[in-house]
């Protein structure tokens, strides 16, 4: 019996395993939407000749040819002949700053993965471009010849054939310098730039040396400056940290003092505030016995990027309520106003306004009616589907007016006064007292009876 139960349990487990739903991975479209690839120089110009140490810009175009959903991906692999300069991710955005996809780069596999956002759920006709910066992998290229490089495109490959020339190093060590400056991007935080300035490697005697730094656009100072004094053997003999701040001309100064057989290394950081292709700073050294010497340094942004576009969904069509002419509006009641009787449309009160029906009188004009009820001629024509400004006596117009205006122009009803009598302490109305000008049918009747009685009396006496 136990064996039967065991067999039954095993069968149930097997069936359950087959029937259990499995989570499906998001669709990866690979390179199927990428239509073209090209190699460019750092100015974004297509090129075919490069040096072995050139920095190459790889540019792709893409067109989304079918519906895609958020969470789905496109992927590109980096050819073996190239090495990425920057492994930071980047957003693929439209011109309004909306993110179409987010790109991540796997340094180990050399794969760029673009994951679609919710943008693709509501937009169509998606297309765009992206780029990444790379150098040539010296292990996988041949210099002074054409190198076929296969790039993934349309889930196959497109071969580009750049000519890569060898770089010959020149002889000599170069003369010592007075000012030298260089910069680089931080390895992890691509918004931080590290700047290094070397002063007086030539070991020239300088009295009262002053260093001036001019910061280029797109960046601001970050923290302090570190000043290291070195002897003739470039050994650090003193270190000084100074606060730095920009003046109105985006300069800051550091007092270096007298330099006798000494050199100086200054380091400081800046924070990128505006995305640019490059960031430039200027270094200037002057002294009592030294005319100003300046050098510029530039850090190029070798990060990846891209942009795209999509057609947004059409705005929903607002359905207009069916037109109901004034003659067919449901009427709740009629009120007397300064402008004659107005019919109140049933259940029309909304946001402090109410719909009424006005009957056109002789001499009425559209501007006149509009002025009476504090509305515009255009509104009256719209509410009544009027195509001309002509009105006819007896014509009904529906108007949406302020409820406060209706209260203001409404004529209060005339109150009738009644005669009363007291019965057991309770006052009760016994009849309506006649108003001035009223006619009472009982007056002629009583008068007639009185005349008959008088005639009868005089007749008996005679």
From Swiss-Prot:
Location in the cell: Secreted, Cell wall
Pfam families recorded: Big_8, Collagen_bind, LysM
Keyword annotations from UniProtKB, A to Z: Cell wall, Peptidoglycan-anchor, Secreted, Signal
InterPro entries in the cross-refs: Adhesion_dom_sf (IPR008966), Collagen-bd_dom (IPR008456), Fibrogen-bd_dom1 (IPR011252), LysM_dom (IPR018392), LysM_dom_sf (IPR036779), SDR_Ig (IPR041171)
Propeptide position ranges: 437-462
Major localization listed first in the record, in broad terms: secreted
LysM domain residues: 356-399
Membrane topology, record value: Peptidoglycan-anchor
UniProt induction comment: More prevalent in stationary than exponential phase (at protein level).
Listed CDD domains: LysM
List of residues that carry Pentaglycyl murein peptidoglycan amidated threonine: 436
Annotated signal peptide: 1-25
GO CC term (a single one): extracellular region
Any Gene Ontology biological process: cell adhesion
Gene Ontology MF annotations: collagen binding; lytic endotransglycosylase activity
Motif segment (LPXTG sorting signal): 433-437
Keyword Signal carried by entry: yes
PANTHER family recorded: LYSM DOMAIN-CONTAINING GPI-ANCHORED PROTEIN 2, MEMBRANE-BOUND LYTIC MUREIN TRANSGLYCOSYLASE D
This protein's name: Cell wall protein Lmo0880
Source organism of this protein record: Listeria monocytogenes serovar 1/2a (strain ATCC BAA-679 / EGD-e)
Species lineage: Bacteria, Bacillati, Bacillota, Bacilli, Bacillales
């Amino acid at each position: 019996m136990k064996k039967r139960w065991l067999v039954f349990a095993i069968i149930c487990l097997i069936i359950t395993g087959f029937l259990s739903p499995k989570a499906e991975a998001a669709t990866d479209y690979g390179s199927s939407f990428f239509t073209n690839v090209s190699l460019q120089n750092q100015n974004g110009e297509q090129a075919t000749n490069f040096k072995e140490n050139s920095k190459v810009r790889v540019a792709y175009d893409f067109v989304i040819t079918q519906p895609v959903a958020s969470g789905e991906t496109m992927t590109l692999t980096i050819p073996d002949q190239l090495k990425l300069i920057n492994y930071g991710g980047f957003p693929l955005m439209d011109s309004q700053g909306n993110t179409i996809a987010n790109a991540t780069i796997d340094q180990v596999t050399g794969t760029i993965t673009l994951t679609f956002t919710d943008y693709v759920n509501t937009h169509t006709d998606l297309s765009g471009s992206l780029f990444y910066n790379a150098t040539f992998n010296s292990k996988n290229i041949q210099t002074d010849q054409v190198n076929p490089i296969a790039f993934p495109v349309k889930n196959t490959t497109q071969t580009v054939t750049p000519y890569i020339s060898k770089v010959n190093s020149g002889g000599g060590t170069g003369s010592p310098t007075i000012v030298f400056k260089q910069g680089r991007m931080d390895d992890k935080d691509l918004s931080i730039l590290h700047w290094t300035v070397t002063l007086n490697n030539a070991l020239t005697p300088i009295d009262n040396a002053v260093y001036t730094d001019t910061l280029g656009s797109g960046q601001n100072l970050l923290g302090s400056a570190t000043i290291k004094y070195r002897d003739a053997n470039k050994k650090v003999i003193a270190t000084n940290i100074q606060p730095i701040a920009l003046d109105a001309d985006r300069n800051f100064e550091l007092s270096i003092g007298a330099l006798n057989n000494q050199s100086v290394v200054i380091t400081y950081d800046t924070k990128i505030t505006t995305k640019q292709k490059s960031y430039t700073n200027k270094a200037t050294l002057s002294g009592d016995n030294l005319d100003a010497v300046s050098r510029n340094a530039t850090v190029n942004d070798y990060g990846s990027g891209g942009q795209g576009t999509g057609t947004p969904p059409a705005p929903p069509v607002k359905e207009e309520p069916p037109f109901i002419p004034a003659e067919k509006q449901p009427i709740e009641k009629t009120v007397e106003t300064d402008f004659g009787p107005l019919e109140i449309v049933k259940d029309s009160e909304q946001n402090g306004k109410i719909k009424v029906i006005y009957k056109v009188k002789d001499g009425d004009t559209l501007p006149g009616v509009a002025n009476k009820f504090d509305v515009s001629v255009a509104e009256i024509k719209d509410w009544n589907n009027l195509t001309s400004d002509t009105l006819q006596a007896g014509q009904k117009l529906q108007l949406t007016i302020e409820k406060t205006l209706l209260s203001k122009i409404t004529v209060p009803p005339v109150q009738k006064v009644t005669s009363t009598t007291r019965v057991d302490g309770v006052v009760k109305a016994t009849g309506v007292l006649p108003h001035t000008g009223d006619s009472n049918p009982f007056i002629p009747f009583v008068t007639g009876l009185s005349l008959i009685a008088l005639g009868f009396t005089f007749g008996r006496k005679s």
